[in-house]
Amino acid sequence: MFSDKMILIAGPCVIEEEETTLEIAAKIQEIVAPYADHIHWIFKSSYDKANRSSIHSYRGPGLKEGLRILSKVKQTFGVEILTDVHSPEEARAAAEVCDILQIPAFLCRQTDLLVAAAETQAVINIKKGQFLSPWDMQGPVDKVLSTGNSKIILTERGCSFGYNNLVSDMRAIAVLSKMGFPVVFDGTHSVQLPGGLKTHSGGQTEFIPTLTRAALAAGAHGLFIETHTNPAIAKSDAASMLSLKAFEVLLPVWNQLYQCVRSFEMASV
């Protein structure tokens, strides 16, 4: 589905203004361009963050306006688009614009949502819930496969570890890989401190380099990275997003590590 290139799902957490979204997409494209032979970039952003901690938090522009902006990103930069869907009713509309439909971690066991998304025949990225073991992901996978759609990505994003904390078990990469689909590691949501700031989630971005390197070394097929020109003023997940400046510094490291691990795996076959 993605050949041997490293999958890189990257973009801002939520769609903000159209100008901001296009600016971020342009910068990511510029950063990724030198690695086009080795990296498969997919732009991601959400039209609605339906699970914000507070009723007062910004959720996004909504389905109609959000898809319009994502369509403009797709047309302007010629990039594949990923967004998350939250109900069966949203899946068909989102699939008209987006190449990949994402099932949010909190909703990864919702049968009707999984089936509706899969029936569009889009690629389905299932994010593993913080409450699931890696082997429990076989259930969501089977629900997607029941529709005849086998275009699946599995994303590991950490497990709940007590209150307001997550931990990443790299054994999950190996377990999920045995299901036969590309496994992506979410390097930014994995450093969240869910609800840690009362009305919104905190984050420990200083651990993004460590965890992303570990995931690639463990055999992940790619990374999911939320990034922003200025995370401090981002309207969602400001505490856990990676700055574009840091993204640019880390990208060659990720690329080299991915190529090294893939070379080792090929030599071991």
UniProtKB/Swiss-Prot annotation:
Gene Ontology BP terms:
keto-3-deoxy-D-manno-octulosonic acid biosynthetic process
- Annotated metabolic or biological route of this protein: Carbohydrate biosynthesis; 3-deoxy-D-manno-octulosonate biosynthesis; 3-deoxy-D-manno-octulosonate from D-ribulose 5-phosphate: step 2/3; Bacterial outer membrane biogenesis; lipopolysaccharide biosynthesis
- Spell out the molecular function terms from Gene Ontology: 3-deoxy-8-phosphooctulonate synthase activity
Q: Where does the record place it?
A: Cytoplasm
Q: Which Pfam families match?
A: DAHP_synth_1
Q: Which InterPro entries does UniProt cross-reference here?
A: Aldolase_TIM (IPR013785), DAHP1/KDSA (IPR006218), KDO8P_synthase (IPR006269)
- Predominant cellular place of this UniProt entry's protein: cytoplasm
Q: What is its EC number?
A: 2.5.1.55
Keywords in UniProt for this one?
Cytoplasm, Lipopolysaccharide biosynthesis, Transferase
Q: What are the GO cellular component annotations?
A: cytoplasm
Q: Which reaction does it catalyse?
A: D-arabinose 5-phosphate + phosphoenolpyruvate + H2O = 3-deoxy-alpha-D-manno-2-octulosonate-8-phosphate + phosphate
Q: Which residues form a coiled coil?
A: none
Q: Which HAMAP family match?
A: KDO8P_synth (MF_00056)
Protein family per UniProt: Belongs to the KdsA family.
Q: What is this protein called?
A: 2-dehydro-3-deoxyphosphooctonate aldolase
Naturally occurring in which organism (per UniProt)? Chlamydia abortus (strain DSM 27085 / S26/3) (Chlamydophila abortus)
Question: Taxonomically, what lineage is the organism?
Answer: Bacteria, Pseudomonadati, Chlamydiota, Chlamydiia, Chlamydiales
